Amino acid sequence: MQNKPSFILRNPSANKGTGFNNEEREKLGLKGLLPPKVESLQEQSDRALSQFTSFNTNLERYIFLNCLRDRNETLFYYLLSNNLELMMPIIYTPTVGEACQKFGNEFRFAQGMYFASQDKGNIRAMMDNWPAEGVDIIVVSDGSRILGLGDLGTNGMGIPVGKLQLYVAGAGFCPTRTLPVIIDSGTNTKKYLEDKYYLGERHPRIPDSEYYPLVDEFLAAAFNKWPKVIVQFEDISNDHCFNLLDEYRNKYLCFNDDIQGTGSVILSGFINAVRSVQKPIKEHRMVFLGAGSAGIGVADCIMSLFDEAGVSKEEARKSFWFVDSKGLITTTRGDELTSQKKQYAREDYTYQLKSLLEVVRDVKPTAIIGLSGIGGSFSQEVIEEMAKHVEKPIVFALSNPTTNAECTAEQAYQWTDGRCIFASGSPFKPVEYKGKTFVPGQGNNMYIFPGLGLAASVCEAKHVTDAMIITAAKTLASFVEDSEVLTGKIYPGLQHIREISTRIAVKVIEKAYEEGMAQLPRPDNIEALVKSRQYVPSYDKSKN
């Protein structure tokens, strides 16, 4: 059955479309089923790019790309790899956010696997239904905190799907050995529970007493089925993500990109921002807006810079101020703090600061870092107040998607009179201000997670350690030259992502061997090993 010509043309991993040559068409029984012309992969890509640019909206472009992937996987990844800067905002932030919100309405075909609360006790058996022979990487979400959009439930599947497409394009994971997963534990979003097109289980989120055993069963089943797989947790709500990472990071090969990946990529940008302002790390005062998984993850990574400067953790924490919905986080505020917030709660405040503006006036920060998910929360008054006291303010407006950014790049440059070092989570176009062109930095996890995941997979790491995360950040930072840093550039161009991911993988593998985390016998040439494992989209299978 699977050798029928119709099956070959409908199998995205095998289909070449008009790329089948005449000999293949004869051998496979495809004569007459395709137009006569035989096209190269580049010719097919040129047409696909023309089709892509012809659509009027980014959501239409997103749907087109995913339909292409479901038709011809090789062509999709060839097109994506050669146009990554153009297409990354489509397959991932910010467009993927809209796609997730409209997942039920725009559903065309199933991708990945879904494990619901009703499947408890059957997850391992269900995994045998996955058609691929092996899996190297899983990205799993429960849909509870999708980007800055909140609880989308099963609609969040677009995030694991898009993330794995970036793993393939950025690092060279083999697409047939990737698995996107949704653990459907319900949703508390009334709109979706009442939406006739919603495809998930229609009940509120299950209690922790059921949730944690469900996740535990999933992980045990995954590592039983694929012992060398790496699992990346994605977009899981703050009330669960820290607990899951703490529970499993030393048991399985796994990491949380929202905590560790975000921390690593922002650490890299901060390293270069510090280089740019030419002020020692010990002299920086950092105000964070948002104390969730990403904010705490970033602060934990930045703490490593203080450690390298010989500053104790207790002393280093005095350089951090966290602001949440209730104001400055202090030990005397009177509310119940999570363990993550407690470690950064200020002990030296007998008075309460209720707003970000009050905190900025009080602290006079050198850096303000937004991971709040609240668009526009860096007001003109806040940024101008900060800029009064700092020659080169560091402004990181990192919330995704673009509509949730704390301020725009244009606002940051205007309100600081072009003096700030700016980075965002989603892309912004270059800004013209007073005759000068500013290119905003994008603190995109895409710089980190492909190379980090590839490293862990290639060397068969036992676990992903803090040292490996920090090594990835430092490697990324090294791609920006001193002369570029002084102009305000803090991240390299994404067009170099395969080179960046390869170098990060090599350096992280070296760190894994240094720490005794790598289980694969050490090769003579780590870089050669990494490159030998990287997928290249081609109809010549000898290249894959």
UniProtKB/Swiss-Prot annotation:
One of its GO terms (molecular function) is malate dehydrogenase (decarboxylating) (NADP+) activity. Induction: By cAMP and the MADS-box protein srfA. InterPro entries: Aminoacid_DH-like_N_sf (IPR046346), Malic_enzyme_CS (IPR015884), Malic_N_dom (IPR012301), Malic_N_dom_sf (IPR037062), Malic_NAD-bd (IPR012302), Malic_OxRdtase (IPR001891), NAD(P)-bd_dom_sf (IPR036291). Divalent metal cations. Prefers magnesium or manganese. NADP(+) binds at residues 287-303. Its cofactor is Mg(2+); Mn(2+). The record marks D258 as: Important for activity. A divalent metal cation binds at E234, D235, D258. GO terms for biological process: malate metabolic process; pyruvate metabolic process. GO terms for cellular component: cytoplasm. The keyword Calcium does not apply. Residues 12-21 have a biased composition (Polar residues). PROSITE patterns: MALIC_ENZYMES. Expressed in the fruiting body. Its EC number is 1.1.1.40. It catalyses: (S)-malate + NADP(+) = pyruvate + CO2 + NADPH; oxaloacetate + H(+) = pyruvate + CO2. The keyword Cell inner membrane does not apply. Pfam families: malic, Malic_M. NAD(+) binds at R145, D258, N400. The active site is at Y92, K163. Its main location: cytoplasm. Belongs to the malic enzymes family. Homotetramer. This is NADP-dependent malic enzyme. It comes from Dictyostelium discoideum.
